């Protein structure tokens, strides 16, 4: 059924469909009785799926990745869609329109998306007001980025301002320095640039702070960011963002679409590689959230057993439909029971030793 609906929706421009579908989801979950019914039906109800991570209780490990609900206008929607949590944003200290359209493209042969949205959002202040007015049934993290017009040498103050506004209201904060769609942003992943940003955010809030990294980092850069995260006392790392690589894509004409980051299956292999590397290096000290190319319950299970305590998806939701998160959670629960695991935590990293030696 959803396959037919998806084919019809894919006849329309992607960003228009996003706005339409998002509006429908918000409308369908606006009434409290309906929302509660959907949450009971679609949500992760098996106790084995629940876990407490950096002091926050998550009913299920799969969350909505940042980018879908940029301004937190669907805060009451995501539990009813079966997610164990949601990450809203990316928001910036100042409102901004993002990049000119068209800026979102489908790669159907790859079941992927290409976007160059550019952090279009209403600002951290507007999100803070929404967070203060709503009490979602699942944890809500906030992803913060740099305002495009803010010079790199003022990035610390920009991130600090966002953290001050939304930090007290979020379940956790993610410092996004890995989007390819804000000029110069990825340069902030260099340790000498990243250190003062993370230190400023940590000083501004007692909320757990994580950093989101790109799949295109070299292994040595991944190691340096991981070591910095441990040194500063971050809660964890989100790995990974979209990739700028075009290697192996099947959809014709991708080269004519222009710049942007690709999400979905094309990033899956590298995302898993980065996860494995991080777990071997800092998995005993940091929480790892895996995102990038998760489509099936088997994909999700691979990430958990490789070291991810939590998972996120966006593109899989687009291609998988409204039952996607339920199918993922049901599949994880089934594998936990079949494997004799008493909890999700017991399964995290259970297959890591078979994936290679720790990095030198």
UniProtKB/Swiss-Prot annotation:
Q: Where in the cell?
A: Cell membrane
- What's one GO BP annotation on this UniProt entry? 'de novo' pyrimidine nucleobase biosynthetic process
Q: Does the keyword Iron-sulfur apply?
A: no
Q: Which GO terms describe its cellular component?
A: cytoplasm; plasma membrane
User: Sorted alphabetically, which NCBIfam families does this protein's record hold?
Assistant: PRK05286.1-2, PRK05286.2-1, PRK05286.2-5, pyrD_sub2
Q: Answer whether the UniProt record assigns the keyword Cell membrane to this protein.
A: yes
Q: Return any one Pfam family short name.
A: DHO_dh
Which cofactors?
FMN
Q: What broad class describes the main subcellular location of this protein?
A: membrane
Q: What is this protein called?
A: Dihydroorotate dehydrogenase (quinone)
**Pathway(s) this gene product operates in, as recorded in its UniProt entry:** Pyrimidine metabolism; UMP biosynthesis via de novo pathway; orotate from (S)-dihydroorotate (quinone route): step 1/1
Q: How is the cofactor bound?
A: Binds 1 FMN per subunit.
Gene source species:
Mycobacterium marinum (strain ATCC BAA-535 / M)
Concerning its family, UniProt says: Belongs to the dihydroorotate dehydrogenase family. Type 2 subfamily.
Alphabetic keyword roster: Cell membrane, Flavoprotein, FMN, Membrane, Oxidoreductase, Pyrimidine biosynthesis
Task: Report the EC code(s) recorded for this entry.
Answer: 1.3.5.2
Q: How does it assemble?
A: Monomer.
This protein's membrane topology, according to the annotation, is: Peripheral membrane protein
Report residues binding FMN: 66-70, 90, 143, 176, 212, 240, 264, 293, 314-315
User: What is the documented function of this protein?
Assistant: Catalyzes the conversion of dihydroorotate to orotate with quinone as electron acceptor.
């Amino acid at each position: 059924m959803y396959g037919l609906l998806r084919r019809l929706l894919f006849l329309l421009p992607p960003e228009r469909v996003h706005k339409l579908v998002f509006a429908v989801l918000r409308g369908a979950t606006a009434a409290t009785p309906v929302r509660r019914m959907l949450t009971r039906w679609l949500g992760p109800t098996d106790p084995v799926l629940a876990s407490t991570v950096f002091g926050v209780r998550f009913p299920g490990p799969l969350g909505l990745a940042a980018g879908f609900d940029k301004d937190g206008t669907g805060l009451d929607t995501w539990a009813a869609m079966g997610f164990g949590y949601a990450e809203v944003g990316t928001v910036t200290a100042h409102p901004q329109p993002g990049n000119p359209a068209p800026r979102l493209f489908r790669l159907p042969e790859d079941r992927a998306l290409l976007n160059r949205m550019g952090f279009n959002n209403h600002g951290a202040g507007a999100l803070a007001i929404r967070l203060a007015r709503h009490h979602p049934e699942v944890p809500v993290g906030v992803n913060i980025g740099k305002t495009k017009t803010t010079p790199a040498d003022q990035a610390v103050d920009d991130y600090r301002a966002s953290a001050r506004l939304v930090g007290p209201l979020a379940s956790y904060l993610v410092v996004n320095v890995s989007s390819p769609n804000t000029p110069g942003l990825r340069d902030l992943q260099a340790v000498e640039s990243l250190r003062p940003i993370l230190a400023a955010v940590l000083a501004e809030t007692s909320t757990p702070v994580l950093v989101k990294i790109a799949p295109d980092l070299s292994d040595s850069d991944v190691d340096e960011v991981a070591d910095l995260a441990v040194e500063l006392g971050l809660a964890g790392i989100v790995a990974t963002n979209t990739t700028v690589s075009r290697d192996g894509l099947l959809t014709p004409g991708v080269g004519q679409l222009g710049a942007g980051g690709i999400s979905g299956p094309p990033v899956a292999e590298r995302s898993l590689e980065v996860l494995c590397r991080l777990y071997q290096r800092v998995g005993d000290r940091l929480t790892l959230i895996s995102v990038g190319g998760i489509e099936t319950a088997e994909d999700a299970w691979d990430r958990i057993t490789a070291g991810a305590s939590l998972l996120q998806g966006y593109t899989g939701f687009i291609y998988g439909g409204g039952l996607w998160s339920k199918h993922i959670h049901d599949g994880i629960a089934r594998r936990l029971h079949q494997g004799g695991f008493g909890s999700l935590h017991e399964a995290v990293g259970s297959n890591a030793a078979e994936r290679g030696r720790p990095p030198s």
